[in-house]
Amino acid sequence: DVYLASSCTEEWGGDGAPKIVAELQRRGIELFLVCDEGGAIITEPIGGIHGNFAMVGVFEKGKADVKFTARSNGGHASAPSKGTPIARLSAFVNEVETHSPFRKKLLPEVSAMFTELAPYAGFGMKLVFGNVWLFGPVLKAVMPAISAQAGAMLKTTIAFTVQKGSDAYNVLPQEAYVGANMRFIPHQGEKESLEIIKKVADKYGLETEVLHANDYTPPVDIHGEAFHLVEQTIADTFPGLPSSPYVMTGATDAQFYQPICKNCIRFAPVVYGPEQMKGMHGLNENIEYNLSLIHISEPTRLALI
């Protein structure tokens, strides 16, 4: 049987997908394979590797929204004391940005990605990507500089996205805060990553409040039947298109299907060039309509596995 599930609440974290899963559970249905968005046909997936590649998402990093608050007695800005809330928050953000407390590691899925991409790289990158067992330390050191996307596949990340201080320029705030979005990697999951960042925040006298958190999803077996079926379908539909495992640094509704499916794969037959990748959730977000949903006349096999 084939089920087409659609929810309009994914972008804002609504309950559309969980309700669908709850109904499937009520019916006693377990799925062999789920195909959601996330991975795609990506042009230049890593700097220095040119061409189109089917990047198949095999798991999602966990995520959390965290609020860090600094407090003081306030006062007038004409006579500031040291260690104001904003000063402490700034020092905290600076430390986390310049000296990440999270450990980098090459996961099996990431190593497999580099191995698959190696034949399409220049000599130097081909040598490194094709011998991850030897050049792993080099990759961990240079990949964040080459590609932010690849760097995010190596460790837990934190991005500071919200801030608030005083309501007036001449008033020292009694309370100021910054908000951050964290993405957890399997080797330092939700619990460990939150403990690590709290220890750093404690150094600056900050309160840490976790507003929402969920851990990473179990990886799909990249040597299993479901993953190979998707790879074969891609090869049949797009002859000559290389495919590779891919770590989803963002989030999709597929995460909610994990209780009823061991093979939640993130891939849509849509082409994303460098401009589309840079514009995602930003200025001039767009998609090349003439390149999307290629070969839809072929009974849309990939969407209906």
Predicted regions and their residues:
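Acidic/histidine-rich catalytic neighborhood of metal-dependent amide-processing enzymes
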Residues: 1-55
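Short, solvent-exposed loop/turn segments at the edges of secondary structure
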Residues: 15, 29-30, 50-51, 59-65, ...
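An extended, acidic, His-containing surface patch that forms the Zn2+-binding/catalytic region
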Residues: 42-43, 50, 102-167, 174, ...
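Flexible glycine/proline-enriched surface loops and loop-helix/loop-strand junctions
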Residues: 49-52, 69-76
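A common structural junction motif
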Residues: 96-101, 199-206
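Positively charged, low-complexity/disordered segments
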Residues: 298-301, 305
